[in-house]
């Protein structure tokens, strides 16, 4: 099955050349990552707003030899409490078709109590779709991916999926798709996001969930972030913030913004 793009022309240009031009404009200066990336956190807003921040994470993956990606994001319209996997086929974007790794998808599905095969839930969800053009820009056709979107994002689900991922037979890089605090003043977004990011960097999983609830941090893909944190903690990886921004940096309206973060988890080689 080929999944057709749901948000081309809305979250990113539907024209191939315009899309390539926009992504290539997100030139960022950053140091080489001197360790082996196991995963990243990336935003999933319209890429004119969050693409520059997202590029920090994708640049961190540039020199990795691993070309199989598990992309986990939120289901913004959850019809089920379960996590939905798109098990086979490909996803179409203006840059071509990206191939699903059916072997890894099948393993992940079998390893988890909470993952169900559910292509329909992916049909209009954007949190994974907006990542595909970045991977195509970076790696052409030389990658595969597995898409999973979360309904319930609580710790029990995150722990189950993290455990399922750690039992996969092939190496992969985890892409956790999440925006951070939504639609508050930029100073409030900065405070809430940095409070949450400090928990992420410290691999404080309980503190992370406590902060989400106590501070009402509206990070829509928090379950995906938690999965990355759990895996990083279990294997002794470290997490670092690469970049943080908000939509006001593009619109110049700082009264009601959305926060974006680029974060990498890696272990020493």
Curated annotation (Swiss-Prot):
CDD domains: MEMO_like. It comes from the Archaea. Belongs to the MEMO1 family. This is MEMO1 family protein TV1383. It comes from Thermoplasma volcanium (strain ATCC 51530 / DSM 4299 / JCM 9571 / NBRC 15438 / GSS1).
